[in-house]
Amino acid sequence: MKIHIIAVGKIKENYINNGINFYLKKLRPYCEIEIREVEEEKAPQNLSEKEKEEILRKEGERILSKIKKGSFVVSLAIEGKEIDSYKFSQFIKATFQSGYREMTFVIGGSLGLWENIKKQSHLNLSFSKMTFPHQLMRLILLEQLYLAFDGKNHL
């Protein structure tokens, strides 16, 4: 089983990096996992809708170039489907049992995700209706993946 996380931007906060490294280490016995970062576009204040769409497109094209063919793609989006931790673990299990060998989770930048990526994804998933910093979403995703794999949620 391989899990790819494609995320926009670099993480500068040590506490988030420490948490990410903690969960990556805990996940390695269960699956092969990697995080790929794509460059985040600089977004000036007071963007027009056209400027916002252009930034999302550029980031989106970078993301698309990193997605491996044949991977089950899950985009993290606030308007996506909400599920609890148990259902998330069952979803991971069912996806791999259905023949997929790789899953790719996509985390957008500060402006969100390009619509084309959401349309091309197998699933748009929301962890909450609340807004979280995109850097923190990596840590939250890794923690949920660990819960799914460690046996407490029957994976």
Curated annotation (Swiss-Prot):
Binding site for S-adenosyl-L-methionine: L76, G108, F127, S128, K129, M130, T131, F132
Main location per the UniProt record: cytoplasm
Entry-linked CDD domains: RlmH-like
InterPro entries: Alpha/beta_knot_MTases (IPR029028), RlmH-like (IPR003742), tRNA_m1G_MTases_N (IPR029026)
Signal sequence extent: none
Record's subcellular location: Cytoplasm
Record's catalysed reaction(s): pseudouridine(1915) in 23S rRNA + S-adenosyl-L-methionine = N(3)-methylpseudouridine(1915) in 23S rRNA + S-adenosyl-L-homocysteine + H(+)
Broad EC category: transferase
Protein purpose: Specifically methylates the pseudouridine at position 1915 (m3Psi1915) in 23S rRNA.
Subunit (UniProt): Homodimer.
Protein name in UniProt: Ribosomal RNA large subunit methyltransferase H 2
Encoding gene (name): rlmH2
